[in-house]
């Protein structure tokens, strides 16, 4: 099959401090990732790549366009970008469903609309930034009872706040990451089991709790000799030790539906020492 993949990139300065950018591209992929889950309370993923064929695994086709405007002056960078993406040829096997569509095999497309916004400021030894992302991501599988519904990765809002301070040989950083919860599918309350199977609500009609994580780190550079330098660093992941649920699914156990939650790491210190010859 003959495939054309055009690209478009236009940048234009607007005065001294503004710039507008328009991007567009077509892409294709001849392999698709198949995700299978161990059918128990562990829910362990088994991933493999499979070549596209003429039957149940089509060639993935991506169409994407974006338009952005940025402002840069006196250490300030302010940027906003809107984008649209449509991906045809995705399969249910590749999306990691753990609900009523876990064992369904069909193909469809994914539409994503979003906006990214960032503000960054450099001031003396400080470099600080704030970013916000909005996204609306939907699946369409025409062979499913619900043709269109939110995608498994439809994280509607995300905020990142960070700063670092550098003085001499020492660099100290801190960051905050927050996002609204991932979509999830819950059983029908009061009628959780029907015909021996879990009776689910509409696909991805609920969300997990919001995700919040604070990290800090410090890195010190020094010399061991004229020809050898070293880096000594310490970092703490999830400083507040917050319990963040990153996935939730359901299984039948002793004729009752049980929820299985997967949590991210709690407070996790790390220490590094690197020698450069």
Regions found by a protein language model. Give the residues of each.
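Short loop/turn motifs that connect adjacent beta-strands in outer-membrane beta-barrel proteins
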Residues: 17, 75, 125, 169, ...
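Transmembrane beta-barrel architecture of outer-membrane proteins
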Residues: 2-6, 24-28, 61-65, 73, ...
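Outer membrane beta-barrel strand-and-loop segments of large Gram-negative receptors
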Residues: 54, 58, 64, 77-131, ...
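C-terminal beta-signal and adjacent terminal beta-strands/loops
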Residues: 88, 178-194, 212-213, 218-277
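Transmembrane beta-barrel strands of outer-membrane/channel proteins
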Residues: 22-26, 69-71, 80-84, 130-134, ...
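Surface-exposed extracellular loop regions of Gram-negative outer-membrane beta-barrel proteins
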Residues: 16-65, 82-102, 175-196, 242-247
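Gram-negative outer-membrane beta-barrel transporters
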Residues: 84-86, 105-188
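Residues on the lipid-exposed face of transmembrane beta-strands in outer-membrane beta-barrel proteins
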Residues: 8-12, 57, 67-71, 115-121, ...
């Amino acid at each position: 099959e003959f495939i054309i993949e055009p690209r478009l990139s236009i940048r234009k300065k607007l005065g001294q401090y503004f710039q507008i950018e328009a991007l567009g591209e077509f892409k294709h992929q001849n392999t698709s990732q198949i995700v299978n889950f161990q059918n128990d309370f562990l829910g362990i993923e088994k991933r493999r790549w499979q070549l596209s064929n003429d039957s149940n695994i089509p060639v993935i086709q991506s169409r994407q366009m974006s338009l952005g405007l940025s402002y840069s002056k006196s250490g300030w960078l302010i940027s906003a970008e809107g984008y649209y993406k449509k991906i045809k040829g995705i399969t249910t096997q590749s999306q990691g469903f753990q609900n009523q569509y876990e064992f369904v095999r069909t193909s469809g497309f994914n539409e994503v609309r979003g906006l990214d916004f960032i503000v960054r400021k450099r001031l003396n030894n400080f470099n600080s930034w704030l970013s916000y992302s909005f996204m609306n991501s939907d699946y369409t599988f025409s062979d499913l009872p619900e043709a269109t519904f939110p995608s498994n990765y439809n994280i509607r809002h995300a905020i990142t706040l960070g700063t670092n301070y550098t003085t001499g040989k020492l660099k100290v950083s801190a960051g905050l990451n927050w996002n609204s919860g991932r979509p999830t599918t819950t059983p029908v309350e009061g009628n959780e089991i029907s015909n021996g199977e879990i009776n689910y609500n509409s696909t991805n009609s609920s969300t997990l709790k919001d995700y919040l994580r604070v990290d800090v780190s410090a890195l010190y550079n020094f010399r061991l000799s004229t020809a050898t330098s070293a880096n000594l660093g310490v970092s703490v992941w999830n400083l507040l030790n917050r319990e963040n649920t990153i996935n939730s699914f359901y299984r039948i156990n002793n004729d009752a539906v049980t929820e299985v939650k997967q949590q991210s790491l709690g407070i996790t210190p790390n220490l590094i020492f690197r020698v450069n010859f």
